[in-house]
């Protein structure tokens, strides 16, 4: 069965329950959350996440698998500022605890940025950080995200991800989040030869490592290294390629998560596209009037 959803908000007093209700309103049967704002480390106590009510609502609506995304501020690739590295290690540990408490098995992580020290140095630091964070027997996997190669990001090639995974002692606790926009922006031909890209990934990393799929179109041409998401079918990857990926038999059991932009001219009143994009992908039929329909909701 197709597992498809989007990023939803976990906030206010209802927290996980609010996230589940938002996902259901989009026709989703999975979803992804941040445990708090992605730009900071302020987090509620686990007992304040409203987990019991949230899980009950999920069960009522057939949602059995969700994903957590670690905040952007974690950078365990930083070799120039020890405080940044230590913050990343400590906070990732606590995020894994929250992920386990919520009942998610995957926490998506941007591997890290070398901030000018070079990819080789950054990758060594990421390996060091992951070896510090991972506890043997933990029931949460860290899903390293395929990156676009913007700035000094590490993980922009399958080889870099494979190097990180190989360096981690308990790498059974590592998986991969395959982002279509990032991989396209990194230079892989996701739009025209996804099977070729997937075969290359399988040879270098192993297809069984993919546990989350971020489904995004791209505003940029292949290899631009920009990381700018576009609505499904309105970017450089295109609807045909993305619906092929979403329904790919080798990725059938993997949760597909949309992170596409809100729509509308009024910056203060943009509308979420997810209900419309999920329906369109389920029906395998591109709707060229989709953006107008989203704006009109």
Swiss-Prot record:
Catalytic EC class: hydrolase
Q: Does the keyword Cell membrane apply?
A: no
Question: Signal peptide: which range, if any?
Answer: none
Q: Where does Zn(2+) 2 bind?
A: 145, 179, 214, 259
What keywords sit in the KW lines? DNA damage, DNA repair, Endonuclease, Hydrolase, Metal-binding, Nuclease, Zinc
What PROSITE patterns does this protein map onto? AP_NUCLEASE_F2_1 (PS00729), AP_NUCLEASE_F2_2 (PS00730), AP_NUCLEASE_F2_3 (PS00731), AP_NUCLEASE_F2_4 (PS51432)
| Protein name, as recorded | Probable endonuclease 4
């Amino acid at each position: 069965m197709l597992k498809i959803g989007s990023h939803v908000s976990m906030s206010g007093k209802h927290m996980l329950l609010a996230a589940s209700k938002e996902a259901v309103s989009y026709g989703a049967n999975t979803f992804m959350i941040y445990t708090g704002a992605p730009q900071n480390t302020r987090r509620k106590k686990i007992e304040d996440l409203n987990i019991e009510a949230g899980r009950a609502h999920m069960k009522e609506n057939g949602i059995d698998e969700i994903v957590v995304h670690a905040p952007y501020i974690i950078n365990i690739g930083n070799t120039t500022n020890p405080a940044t590295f230590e913050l990343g290690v400590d906070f990732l540990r606590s995020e894994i605890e929250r992920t386990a408490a919520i009942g998610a098995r995957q926490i998506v992580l941007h591997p890290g940025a070398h901030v000018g020290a070079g990819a080789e140095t950054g990758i060594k630091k990421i390996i060091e950080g992951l070896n510090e964070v991972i506890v043997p027997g933990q029931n949460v996997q860290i899903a390293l995200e395929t990156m676009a190669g913007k700035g000094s990001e590490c993980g922009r090639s399958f080889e870099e991800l494979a190097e990180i995974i190989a360096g981690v002692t308990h790498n059974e606790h590592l998986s991969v989040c395959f982002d279509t926009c990032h991989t396209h922006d990194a230079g892989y031909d996701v739009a025209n030869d996804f099977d070729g890209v997937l075969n290359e990934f399988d040879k270098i990393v192993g297809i069984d490592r993919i546990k989350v799929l971020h489904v995004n179109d791209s505003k940029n041409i292949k290899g631009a290294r920009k990381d700018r998401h576009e609505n499904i079918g309105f970017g450089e990857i295109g609807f045909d390629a993305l619906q092929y990926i979403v329904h790919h038999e080798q990725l059938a059991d993997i949760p597909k998560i949309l992170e596409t932009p809100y729509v509308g001219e009024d910056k203060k009143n943009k509308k979420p596209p997810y209900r419309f994009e999920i329906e369109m992908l389920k029906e395998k039929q591109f709707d060229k009037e989709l953006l107008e329909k989203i704006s009109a909701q």
